Swiss-Prot record:
The lineage of its organism: Bacteria, Pseudomonadati, Pseudomonadota, Alphaproteobacteria, Rickettsiales. Homodimer. Catalyzes the stereoinversion of LL-2,6-diaminopimelate (L,L-DAP) to meso-diaminopimelate (meso-DAP), a precursor of L-lysine and an essential component of the bacterial peptidoglycan. Pfam families: DAP_epimerase. This is Diaminopimelate epimerase. It is found in: Cytoplasm. GO terms for cellular component: cytosol. The gene is dapF. It is an enzyme of class 5 (isomerase). GO terms for molecular function: diaminopimelate epimerase activity. Belongs to the diaminopimelate epimerase family.
Length: 269
């Protein structure tokens, strides 16, 4: 029997997601497998993340899956996309989105400008290995990671303030998923700073190199502030656009666009 699922496809600076309302998942699905099937760019719809959301009156719950079927704790670009979708559906401009135990306060400035307060980040978590361990591990592959820092944005990030070619970014991104360093993997950010702007490339765990990463922008901005490399406000630049970043009372606030691509019905057996 074929099931039909209504979906919306959106992107934030080229980081695309397929969004489904939980009420449309009436039949029992293996959500991890469904995410993999939908994310496939040849046999599915194609996306970087698969998003399920549910309205709880005062807030919206968001569940995130990567293309490999693994779950994710945060996606900044998908958050902006979902906030815009809710705005288009309801007219609400102040929207609270909850992912796991993290509350994200969203504000629709206009249809092309959505702000997300991701709260405070942490530089001291049990999952974070020492810089010496990271350097020693990278040295096995003849890669010099000059300036690194771990940051938790609700999901784990490693920020590397060193210029690396794309082929080396791929090697480093894959290598640093080793269980001996990061038990559950890590998002690896390659940040270059010039004129108080961060040019950023991100290797997302469960995805690979992506066109943009909102949580990576937040983590890299916070890391740059901590190291004294930048000041607030700042801009994070990706291939397909940029995010405005600022810090207020210890909270990181991201502002950027979200774009509707398509609406349709996904058929699955």
């Amino acid at each position: 029997m074929i099931s039909k699922i209504n979906f919306v496809k959106m992107h934030g600076l080229g980081n695309d997601c397929v969004i489904v309302n939980k009420r449309d998942l009436l039949n029992a699905h293996n959500l991890s497998q469904l995410a993999k099937n939908i994310a496939d760019r040849h046999t599915g719809i194609g996306c970087d993340q698969f998003i399920i959301y549910e309205n709880h009156n005062n807030f919206y719950e968001m569940i995130i899956y990567n293309i490999d079927g693994s779950s994710a704790k945060l996606c900044g670009n998908a958050t902006r996309c979902l906030a815009k979708l809710i705005y288009l559906d309801t007219g609400k401009k102040d929207i609270t989105i909850v992912v796991g135990n993290k509350e994200l306060l969203c504000r629709i400035e206009d249809e092309n400008k959505i702000s997300v307060n991701v709260g405070a980040v942490s530089f001291n978590e049990t999952w974070m290995p020492s810089r010496d361990k990271i350097w020693a591990f990278a040295a096995r592959y003849m890669i010099d990671l000059k300036e690194t820092i771990c940051v938790d944005v609700g999901n784990p990030h490693l920020v590397i303030f060193s210029k690396l070619e794309s082929q080396d970014q791929k090697i480093v991104g894959e290598t640093l998923q080793a269980k001996e360093l990061f038990a559950n993997g890590v998002n690896v950010n390659f940040a270059e700073i010039k004129d108080n702007k961060i040019n950023l490339s991100v290797w997302e765990r469960g995805v690979g190199l992506t066109g943009a990463c909102g949580s990576g922008a937040c983590g890299s901005f916070a890391a740059g502030l901590k190291r004294g490399f930048i000041h607030s406000p700042s801009t994070v630049v990706f291939k397909h656009g940029s995010l405005n970043m600022k810090e207020e009372n210890g909270n990181i606030i991201m502002q950027g666009s979200a774009t509707l691509i398509a609406e349709g019905v996904y058929c699955c057996e």
